[in-house]
C-alpha cells in the first residue's frame, strides 16, 4: 500500500521508491536531514530531496522519470552558432560553490528558490567528499553558466543548471554529456521532465525502468581521474 513515510534524524534507509504517492507524483517521505550518508542512500535508491524553504524536507521518486541516454543529447543550431561566435571556456569542478549560487538565483516570475542555504551547505559537503560535481561555462574570466549534480557509479544525477548568457547552460549540458560518454557513463538522471529538457533530448521512462537501470550501473567503478578539476574540450 502506497503512503507517505515519516523519517527521523537517525534513520538513513528509505522505504521502497515504488511506495511513493501518485499525487503529488513521487512524494515518498518527509523529514530527516541532509546528512551526506542520507543523501547518498537516497540517490543510490533513486530518491532526491526537493522542498521549499518553509517546508520540511521532502523526498521524491516520481513516475515517470526524465533521463538522458548516451548519445541522445540534441545540440541546437543556436548552440552550434554560439560555439563559433563566442570565446567560451568550460571547466569541471573549478567553482562548485559559485555554480550552486548561480542555480539558486530565483528564475523569472519566481519569488524564491528551492536551492536553500541548507541545500547549498549539504551539497558543498558532498562536493568536498567527492560525490557532487559541477561544470562551469566561462566567457573570459566571468562565470556565465553551469550545472551541478551527483555521480553514483556510472549514473550522473543532474540537479540544476543556470545561465547568464544565452546558450551557456546548453553548453554546460553538452560538455557534461561528452564527458560522461568518454567515461562510459550509462545514464544521466534529469528527474522531472520540462520543455527545456525535452528540447535537449531527454526522454521519460517509467520509475520501474529507471530503477532497473540505476541498480544495474550504480556500483560500476569509475576512474579516479574522471572528476579531477580540469578544462574541458568543447566539441564543435
From Swiss-Prot:
Its EC number is 2.3.2.6. This is Leucyl/phenylalanyl-tRNA--protein transferase. InterPro entries: Acyl_CoA_acyltransferase, Leu/Phe-tRNA_Trfase, Leu/Phe-tRNA_Trfase_C, Leu/Phe-tRNA_Trfase_N. GO terms for cellular component: cytoplasm. Belongs to the L/F-transferase family. It comes from Shewanella amazonensis (strain ATCC BAA-1098 / SB2B). GO terms for molecular function: leucyl-tRNA--protein transferase activity. GO terms for biological process: protein catabolic process. It is an enzyme of class 2 (transferase). It catalyses: N-terminal L-lysyl-[protein] + L-leucyl-tRNA(Leu) = N-terminal L-leucyl-L-lysyl-[protein] + tRNA(Leu) + H(+); N-terminal L-arginyl-[protein] + L-leucyl-tRNA(Leu) = N-terminal L-leucyl-L-arginyl-[protein] + tRNA(Leu) + H(+); L-phenylalanyl-tRNA(Phe) + an N-terminal L-alpha-aminoacyl-[protein] = an N-terminal L-phenylalanyl-L-alpha-aminoacyl-[protein] + tRNA(Phe). SUPFAM superfamilies: Acyl-CoA N-acyltransferases (Nat). Keywords: Acyltransferase, Cytoplasm, Transferase. It is found in: Cytoplasm. Functions in the N-end rule pathway of protein degradation where it conjugates Leu, Phe and, less efficiently, Met from aminoacyl-tRNAs to the N-termini of proteins containing an N-terminal arginine or lysine. Pfam families: Leu_Phe_trans. The keyword Coiled coil does not apply.
